[in-house]
Amino acid sequence: MTTVLASRAAIHTETVDYKQGDTTLEGFLAYNDSISGKRPGVLVVHQWFGLTDYEKHRAEMLAQLGYVAFCADIYGKDARPKNVQEAGAQSGKYKSDRMLLRARVNAGLDVLQKNELVDTKRIAAIGYCFGGTTVIELARSGADLNGVVSFHGGLDSPTPADGKNIKCKVLALAGADDPFQNPSDLTAFESEMRDSKVDWQIVFYGGAVHAFTQPDPGFANPGAKYNEKADKRSWEAMKQFFAEIFK
């Protein structure tokens, strides 16, 4: 089921209801209606507050670049955290059940892959914070992707043996001063990538903390703050990565 929301300046957007198991999810699709033919698709995964206007705006930015962008909904249509306690409970539910997390994000990927405008041989996934963790799990699930980009996502490695399932290139964009990024997690992540012979990169932005791409991270904490320079640089890094993987 789709509901048309807007079609301004050739950017078409709509909400898309879909399911994973018995759970109804509500995603968001954006593409440039003035472009004909198939084009690369990009899955966008939300931060811990769930699918918000922030991710929808990123999807529209991707559509302006010529991609079909689909924002996945991990939590469910009726699950929209209103505060940090609810956000923590929702994100924690999926971080503690990686198989469920993988099932939810793969359901969103399936919607994107089935879109008639998408070139299924050219698909990537990006995610922010919780979503950054999620796209790494998507890669670990063995999903058929060209690449994933994690923006200030947690880089823990709970199942390092699953690194061997990764078929795509991996780009992690992180704040060098992010207090939520555990150094031991980084070490484990790097070992997993090396041992699994993944084509991977990590870029650190000096002076940037957690949530550096989000003007309003949704909670007051000096360890989570917008950094305009890191935001712009990381977006450009993503664009360069896409130019490489979508050749």
Segments (PLM) and residue ranges:
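C-terminal catalytic histidine-bearing segment of alpha/beta-hydrolase fold enzymes
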Residues: 194-247
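Primarily recognizes the serine-hydrolase "nucleophile elbow" in alpha/beta-hydrolase
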Residues: 105-166
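Active-site loop/turn elements of alpha/beta-hydrolase fold enzymes
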Residues: 67, 74, 153, 205-207
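Short alpha-helix in the alpha/beta-hydrolase fold that links the catalytic acid
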Residues: 58, 182-193, 201
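Acidic catalytic loop of the alpha/beta-hydrolase fold
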Residues: 177-181, 210
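Short beta-strand/loop motif that positions the catalytic acidic residue
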Residues: 166, 172-174
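Boundary at the C-terminal end of the N-terminal hydrophobic targeting segment
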Residues: 6-11
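Serine-hydrolase catalytic machinery in alpha/beta-hydrolase-like enzymes
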Residues: 15-117, 213-225
